[in-house]
Amino acid sequence: MNAVRRAQAAVAALAVTATAGCAGAGAIGGSENTLVVAIVANPQMQDAIELSERFEEENPDIDLDFVTLPENESRAKITASVATGGGEFDVVMISNFETPQWADNGWLVDLQPYIDQTEGYDAEDFIPSIREALSHEGDMYSVPFYGESSFLVYREDLFQQAGLTMPEQPTWQEIRDLAAELHDPENGMTGICLRGLPGWGENLAPMNTVVNTFGGQWFDEEWNARLDSEEFREATKFYVDMVQDYGIPGAAAAGYGECITRYSQGQAAMWYDATAMVSTVESPQDSVVVGKNGYAPAPVVETDASGWLYSWSLAIPESSDKADDAWKFISWVTDKDYIELVGNELGWERVPPGSRQSTYELPEYQEIAEAYAQPTLDSLSTASQEQTMVEPVPYPGIQFVGIPEFQDLGTRVSQQISAAIAGQISVDEALEQAQRYAESVGESYQEEQ
């Protein structure tokens, strides 16, 4: 089965989810001058909507129509639209998971000619690991709105009060022990926040980094499914147990959005998640813990590092007939000038992090980001399979498996993990079913060897 057919089959599996995800998205479409922009409803994207009037003032012949959806719904809807040539979106927010696959399938406009012709855009300024992750055969097919790895944020003030010290490079067992010390639910404080919400980009993102550093893998180099291995089982049980013992109430339904709210409102002592969290955690408008936080590398077990690599990026579907105007918006919202606009208008803690190297050279950003700028860059620089995995694997990706089937496979497995967190099934039962899902996918690749 070639790549396009694999992708089309994967999209078919997502069709029901995508249809359900349309509800609440709002009417799609507009005049001939309207660009329809599909984005994920995360804080940095909401800032872009707030500032988009500036773009429309500079480009009076272009109107912007934003379609925002929660992460899981957004992934399914955008995937179904782009893969089938639906044509309802002119700009889509995707990631380094979709970009190389969709570029290879011919579903995205090659942005390199636009980049090369746009004076002052400076794509060489993008953080190298992010730029490479969004490229196919040397050309960029999406450009980063923000980039991220993962690290641990913790309340320095609570640690000091309890006489605790965060190790320079913590292990997961050390984090569990610290969570146990700080867990005080009777006073509204949980030891740690970890995602439990189903979704291959929700609970599986942090959990897969735990699996990796424990020595687990989804498939070995012969495409044998390995979700029933001792390493995968040990990592999953560790993650589920910690969420159940020291996580937030209702963790099985808590994703990035719930954790960022919980931590920012002073209700969690630690949180392991995306480095992009800093835009909210350190924002005086959104957080009550500004200036009280320390940042540590992603916890490890058997590896030197374990942070993921991810970028929310913007691309133009081949089905759009407004590529030139779409690039005008994309280049505006991912340019150095936009970074400064956010800083000056909304606050420097709100700038999209992890995309451009020059952001970390701005004096205003350096001043407010002293605690987390270097940890962010360090996490991005160590986010590779070589440094975060024990065993070699036949697929790209750290917190995801970079194959078309993973959107469906990951979603199914994530539902099993969430059910285990909720106490509906055991970890063994969850992984027994997950292994069957993975075996079906692995067998299709074995047939091609």
Model regions and ranges:
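Hinge/lid segment of periplasmic solute-binding proteins
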Residues: 96-149, 203-206, 210, 290-296, ...
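Extracytoplasmic/periplasmic solute-binding protein
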Residues: 136-145, 150, 173-225, 232, ...
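Pocket-flanking alpha-helical
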Residues: 49-53, 72-110, 123-142, 152-153, ...
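Bilobed periplasmic-binding protein-like "clamshell/Venus-flytrap" ligand-binding domains
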Residues: 68, 141-142, 183-199, 335-346, ...
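Conserved N-terminal structural module of periplasmic/extracytoplasmic solute-binding proteins
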Residues: 2-105, 116-123, 252, 302, ...
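Short, solvent-exposed loop/beta-turn-alpha elements that line the ligand-binding surface or hinge
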Residues: 112-126, 168, 196-199, 214-234, ...
